[in-house]
Amino acid sequence: MSSISIFGFFGLATGRRVASQKPGASTKSYHCFYTTALQCSSGVALPAELRVYSPFNDSVLADNTVAFVVAKAHFPRNESVLLEASHIVPLPGDPSSDEYDNNLPDSPYPFIIGLGSVPSRFETLSDGVSKAFNVVSSEFVRDGLKTSSLQCIFDGSRPRWSRTPTPNVNSTIQYFGSFAGVTQDGIPRVTLDSIILNVGHNEPSTAATAPTPIKKWKFAAFAAPMYVHVPFSPDPSSLIYSQRW
């Protein structure tokens, strides 16, 4: 039970489209590869290579295109990060224009969400209040399962972490945050925004269904009310008419 996913805005360059054919397969598949960088709040940028499936008649993006990316990730020690993208949404505009950068979202540091195990106890960082612990996670990247080590940080300057317990050794956690930098050992650091401790197995449950609201806009700021009622009954007192907010 393990995973690593990254999402955020990335600059893409040196795109190339590559064909591959698995042993025994009768057809070729195509992927686009891009050079990119994973920017950290400390000012460090980790070099990365992004791969995404390329459909028929697809073309590569222009150099310096900024796109919103959702990808699985692998962090080999002291090597380029490998990103396996499932979604790439290029932002509108001309990347060669001087005005292109002015219209981009001010969100340069990608977010990470993962599930992994904690192999050792936490350590207190040099500020005397922040705590750090390593997490080991695996993900299917570049046609194989690959394992990565990350260091998660409880930022001591944020009061919300003052009473949060650190994970137990060998426990499984879910973590969410943004990239802060790299340790001296070359392990990426993640400043946590959220953590779930002692993640365990739960039996699957059936999700409740509800009518789909009418779509009016591509992005909605307000949700349309949803009405749910039971079928007609001879007894009026048994009718239910509820409004969910």
Feature names for model-found ranges:
Residues 1-245:
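OB-fold and OB-like single-stranded nucleic-acid-recognition modules
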